[in-house]
Amino acid sequence: EEGGVTLRRLLREARRGKFKPKDILRDSVLIYKRYLEQNKLMFAFIVGERSGGSPVIRKAIRLEEEHFVHEMAQDLRDLGTVPGLSSQTLELICSLVVTTMLNAANDILDLPTDQKQSEQELVDHFVAQLRLIFLGARLWREP
């Protein structure tokens, strides 16, 4: 929980204007990557337990994911990033983002520290995945 609070605060700052709007995705990915690298043991535990751990731990991890989703949805609503979408749809979009972030954690944690090219390719790929989510969100029409 403690690590989640810090990471959510860092990412919230990125979304709320500390960075240029066009750089928010890349800056958020870099913040996330740096945070994972600084907290490898915790995230290795989270990634492993998220799908194979005890039910109590999985529930705690899901609760943190829900906090991320709700906060991000509120920020997107406040920023008008994807106008005209319901709260339910915003939370669906944010759920895709959080799932993508957590799925990328293993790849980030497995990166050798001396392979800058691989690191750049991974960051670029992760940014492209998030960009695709938001491009789709902008085109989404409520049923």
Please report, for each region that a protein language model flagged, where it lies by residue:
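Short helix-capping/turn signature of helix-turn-helix
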Residues: 48-53
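C-terminal effector-binding regulatory domain of bacterial HTH transcription factors
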Residues: 137-143
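Amphipathic alpha-helical packing segments from all-alpha helical-bundle domains
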Residues: 2-9, 35, 55-81, 91-106, ...
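Hydrophobic alpha-helical connector segments
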Residues: 9-38, 87, 93-97, 123
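Short, structured loop/turn "capping" segments at alpha-beta junctions
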Residues: 39, 43-44, 72
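Transmembrane helix-loop junctions in multipass membrane proteins, especially transporters and channels
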Residues: 82, 111-115
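Short, hydrophobic secondary-structure boundary micro-motifs
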Residues: 44-47, 85, 117, 142
